[in-house]
Amino acid sequence: MNERYTFSGHESFYCKSLWLKKGYDFVKSDKNFNAEDAVVYLGVGKNMVSAIRYWLRAFGMLEEGNPTEIADFLFDNKNGKDPYIEDLGTLWLLHYYLVKTEVASIYKLFFSDFHKEKNNEFTREQLQHFLKRKNAETGYNNLYNENTIKRDIGVLLQNYVMPKRDRPNEDFAALLLNLSLIRQSEDDNKTLYFNMNGKNELVPEIFLYAVIDDKKEEMIVPFDRLMDLALIFCLSKSELVDTVLLFVEKYPQQLRYTDDGGIKQLFFLKDFNKNEVLKNYYKKR
């Protein structure tokens, strides 16, 4: 059997803007999500308590009940770089972690595999069929539940698609809305798009962080590998090249980009610590 996908767990709640910080502080205070007073401390209902824990795990902020290194880096009350998520770069970083961790399988499948297959235009129904097919390929057919997948799709879209302006303010509280990565057609309610042209500007350092994180120990990254990452950030091929050239210019001692006879590659000339990239970015804020 192949990789086993996981769906549901969010209790049908998208991730609200302050939930990660609220959940992080809760865990750092040695509180227990299963305790009766969790609803009092967090100020939400029981299902939302479960949802907050789920999103902490899905965004890679919590592992085995403990805050991760990146969670401390961002949210620590004393030294956290962006505890209240005021910087656009933090949103891009959290988006990357949501896709990367695969606690919520739908995000990697959607932004990587489905995006590559469908190009930029899609419907909910097409995404549903795609997820059913991908799940069947794993051999775990008995784990597929149509209603569960529909709820996952609905929550994913709530996380990323800006609601119509006649909706309640509560609908505008999703953490990742400001990235504008997905948009809905103005002509109908069915067609959706990966917002390649209208998304918010990607912070180059966050993409570089993702490249270093993804490449592991490799010192040469082929262009196809970069394009796979670019899909996650809804970057076009030309935007990808521009972004790579930006950070190659900034770090000439560590990086070189070549295009020899159409073979494009990014070379790492020496070891490059991804955490130093983040520290340099947040230092200039």
Describe the predicted segments one by one.
Residues 1-285:
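Donor-sugar nucleotide-binding helix/loop cap in glycosyltransferases
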